[in-house]
A protein has these predicted regions:
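Conserved Rossmann-fold NAD(P)-dependent oxidoreductase catalytic core, especially the SDR/UDP-sugar
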Residues: 6, 31-36, 40-98, 102-106
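Oxidoreductase cofactor-interface core, primarily capturing Rossmann-like NAD(P)-dependent enzymes
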Residues: 8-16, 79-178
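Mid/C-terminal beta-alpha module of Rossmann-like enzyme folds, strongest
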Residues: 10-22, 146-197, 202-231
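Generic anion/oxyanion-binding catalytic loop in active/binding sites
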Residues: 26, 30-32, 80, 132-133, ...
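Conserved beta-strand termini and adjacent loop/short-helix elements that scaffold enzyme active sites
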Residues: 30-32, 105-108, 185-190
């Protein structure tokens, strides 16, 4: 599948899309970089300017049939305190109003061998509120598999889903899991908060089942994440 990135794409969306090239999908930076022809494409949208001209992006696709992928994050809401989550909500609404096939995925914090959050937690950072915040982190490999199944037609291109693990864990428990796992990366690699802490503090418990059912995913169990971090 050819995936066209519309405007700036921030992480984790950019990283997930880049990893999908290993599964045979082609990433294109902007409609102008598309090869000639009428091959179907996916128009990928994520973090960008507050004002995004969806119609203009669609028009630049020319004769290519397209579907739209909205790469969002948990917590996107018009009343969110974090400006980034408000912006994502506006993008979701803007895209939904375009009357084109749209699949919206709201990603939970991603955990895996190379995720910035996992590396950050390994550095034993201080945690807000004693690390009591409950999260539904999801294995990055499950997020990649979700996108792969959407691109190759194994899941219907419709609706919105919370891509989140079924197990609730506190931020402190997640840090403990990360620090106990074997690690072969650079000792000075402290990663980063992904998403930002201010976003995670707004997370409510997610609904994992609709996502898992729609995409035929068996979420990676919490206890397997330590193994995934060294795979």
């Amino acid at each position: 599948m050819i995936v066209v990135c519309a405007g700036p794409i921030g992480n984790p969306a950019a990283r997930l899309l880049a990893l999908l090239t290993a599964r045979g999908h082609q990433m294109v930076k902007g409609p102008e970089a598309l090869p000639p022809g009428e091959e179907p494409v996916v128009l990928a949208i994520s973090d960008g300017p507050s004002v995004f001209d969806y119609l203009a992006a669609v028009q630049r696709l020319g004769p290519h049939p397209f579907r739209t992928l909205m790469l969002s994050r948990l917590g996107a809401h018009p009343d969110a305190r974090a400006a980034s989550l408000q912006r994502l909500w506006r993008l979701e609404e803007h895209v939904r109003a375009g009357n084109a096939p749209v699949l919206t995925l709201r990603f939970a914090p991603l955990v895996g061998a190379e995720t910035p959050l996992w590396r950050r937690l390994r550095s034993r950072p201080a945690l807000p509120n004693g690390g009591r915040k409950l999260l539904n982190p999801v294995a990055e490999r499950d997020a990649i598999e979700t996108l792969d199944r959407a691109f190759d037609g194994r899941a219907r291109w419709e609706g919105w889903y919370e891509v989140a693990g079924p197990e609730a864990v506190t931020l402190a428990e997640l840090r403990d899991l990360a620090t106990k796992a074997p690690f072969s990366g650079p000792p000075a690699d402290t990663g980063e908060w992904e998403p930002a802490l201010e976003e995670m503090m707004e997370h409510r418990l997610a609904e994992s089942q609709p996502w898992a059912s729609h995409f035929g995913i068996v979420p990676t169990p919490l206890g397997a994440w330590a193994g995934a971090a060294t795979a």
